Each structure stands twice: as C-alpha cells, then as structure tokens.
Amino acid sequence: MARTKQTARKSTGGKAPRKQLATKAARKSAPTTGGVKKPHRYRPGTVALREIRRYQKSTELLIRKLPFQRLVREIAQDFKTDLRFQSAAIGALQEASEAYLVGLFEDTNLCAIHAKRVTIMPKDMQLARRIRGERA
C-alpha cells in the first residue's frame, strides 16, 4: 500500500473528560509513605535465557574442583583403598564428566521438546539414556 502524506486537521471538540471517582482521586492524592521502592525483577525466563547464552559461550568447568575431587575419591574407595590421583587425572575425569552431562542434558531437552514441553523431567532423562543404549 502506498504511503500518503498526512495533513493537519482541526479538532472539532469531542467528549469532555470524565470526573474521577472519589476513591481514585483519594488514592492519587495520598502521599507515598516510606518511599520504599520495589526491587527490580526480570520477567520469568529472561534470566534463564541469559544464563543459557552465557554458559554456551564459556568453556570453563561448571562443577567446583574440590567437591568433584572428593566425590571421585569417595567412589574410588569402593574399589581400592589408599588410591592416589594426579591432579591431571582428576582434571581429565572432570572434563569427561562435564562433557557427558552436557550431552545428556541436551538429549534430555530434545526429549522434553518432543513431548511438547519445555520442562525436563526424570522420564526424559531415562528416555535419552535408553535411546543412547546406556540403560536397558
């Protein structure tokens, strides 16, 4: 559709402004007591999307090093006591573990989307592992 030039028109009156109700007028004229401002809140999902973009850009490890190291030592004790680990070995285990978990969560998210949901559930993770052949 072609754009046309707008010309100024003189207003021909119109409706008179309505009178405010007494309650509205009283509410507007009442002074704000305390002056406490509500803290700013982002809409649901905004922060989540920002975090997704941030973590997809980054390459750093997401699990803290010491808790992961304690977990590895605790699991290793079931197989052999007094095992010692090089720091590089713990680092390699952590890299592999995080790569596995990220991939599993990606597949889990695809399963949830396939079910027309945006929230992942345990059944999505079970399905992802079953399709991968990790669990019968």
UniProtKB/Swiss-Prot annotation:
Q: Where in the cell is it found?
A: Nucleus; Chromosome
Q: Which residues are modified to N6,N6-dimethyllysine?
A: 5, 10, 28
Q: Name one Pfam family in it.
A: Histone
* UniProt cross-references to SMART domains, sorted A to Z: H3
Query: What InterPro entries does the record point to?
Result: Histone-fold, Histone_H2A/H2B/H3, Histone_H3/CENP-A
Give the N6,N6,N6-trimethyllysine positions (modified residues).
5, 10, 28, 37
Where in the sequence is N6-acetyllysine found? 5, 10, 15, 24
Q: Highest taxon of the source? A: Eukaryota
Gene Ontology CC: nucleosome; nucleus
Alphabetically ordered keywords of this record? Acetylation, Chromosome, DNA-binding, Methylation, Nucleosome core, Nucleus, Phosphoprotein
Q: Which parts of this chain are annotated as the region Disordered?
A: 1-43
Tissue spec: Highly expressed in nearly all larval and adult nuclei. Expressed only at low levels in intestine. Expressed throughout all stages of gametogenesis.
Question: PTM Phosphoserine: at which residues?
Answer: 11, 29
Report the PTM annotation: Acetylation is generally linked to gene activation. Methylation at Lys-5 is linked to gene activation. Methylation at Lys-10 is linked to gene repression.
Q: Which GO terms describe its molecular function?
A: DNA binding; protein heterodimerization activity; structural constituent of chromatin
Q: Which PANTHER family match?
A: HISTONE H3
Q: Which family does it belong to?
A: Belongs to the histone H3 family.
Q: How does it assemble?
A: The nucleosome is a histone octamer containing two molecules each of H2A, H2B, H3 and H4 assembled in one H3-H4 heterotetramer and two H2A-H2B heterodimers. The octamer wraps approximately 147 bp of DNA.
This chain's function reads:
Variant histone H3 which replaces conventional H3 in a wide range of nucleosomes in active genes. Constitutes the predominant form of histone H3 in non-dividing cells and is incorporated into chromatin independently of DNA synthesis. Deposited at sites of nucleosomal displacement throughout transcribed genes, suggesting that it represents an epigenetic imprint of transcriptionally active chromatin. Nucleosomes wrap and compact DNA into chromatin, limiting DNA accessibility to the cellular machineries which require DNA as a template.
Q: By what name is this protein known? A: Histone H3.3 type 2
Organism equals: Caenorhabditis elegans
